[in-house]
């Protein structure tokens, strides 16, 4: 989910993967 990765980019790499995949 590229959109989520961009939205949570400020959270950090770990946050991108965790939150991005969770909301995918």
From Swiss-Prot:
pH dependence: Optimum pH is 5.0 for NADPH-methemoglobin reductase activity, and 6.5 for NADPH-diaphorase activity.
Record localization: Cytoplasm
GO BP terms: heme catabolic process; megakaryocyte differentiation; negative regulation of insulin receptor signaling pathway
One GO cellular component, as annotated: cytoplasm
Predominant location: cytoplasm
Key words of the record: Cytoplasm, NADP, Oxidoreductase, Transferase
Binding-site positions, NADP(+): 9, 11-12, 14
EC number: 1.5.1.30, 1.3.1.-, 2.6.99.-
Entry annotated with the keyword Manganese: no
Gene Ontology molecular functions: biliverdin reductase [NAD(P)+] activity; FMN reductase (NADH) activity; FMN reductase (NADPH) activity; peptidyl-cysteine S-nitrosylase activity; riboflavin reductase (NADPH) activity
Catalytic activity: reduced riboflavin + NADP(+) = riboflavin + NADPH + 2 H(+); bilirubin IXbeta + NADP(+) = biliverdin IXbeta + NADPH + H(+); FMNH2 + NAD(+) = FMN + NADH + 2 H(+); FMNH2 + NADP(+) = FMN + NADPH + 2 H(+)
Family: Belongs to the BLVRB family.
Subunit structure: Monomer.
Primary role: Enzyme that can both act as a NAD(P)H-dependent reductase and a S-nitroso-CoA-dependent nitrosyltransferase. Promotes fetal heme degradation during development. Also expressed in adult tissues, where it acts as a regulator of hematopoiesis, intermediary metabolism (glutaminolysis, glycolysis, TCA cycle and pentose phosphate pathway) and insulin signaling. Has a broad specificity oxidoreductase activity by catalyzing the NAD(P)H-dependent reduction of a variety of flavins, such as riboflavin, FAD or FMN, biliverdins, methemoglobin and PQQ (pyrroloquinoline quinone).
Listed name of the protein: Flavin reductase (NADPH)
Species assigned in the record: Aquarana catesbeiana (American bullfrog)
Gene: BLVRB
């Amino acid at each position: 989910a590229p959109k989520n990765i961009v939205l949570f980019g400020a959270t950090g790499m770990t946050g991108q993967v965790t939150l991005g995949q969770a909301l995918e």
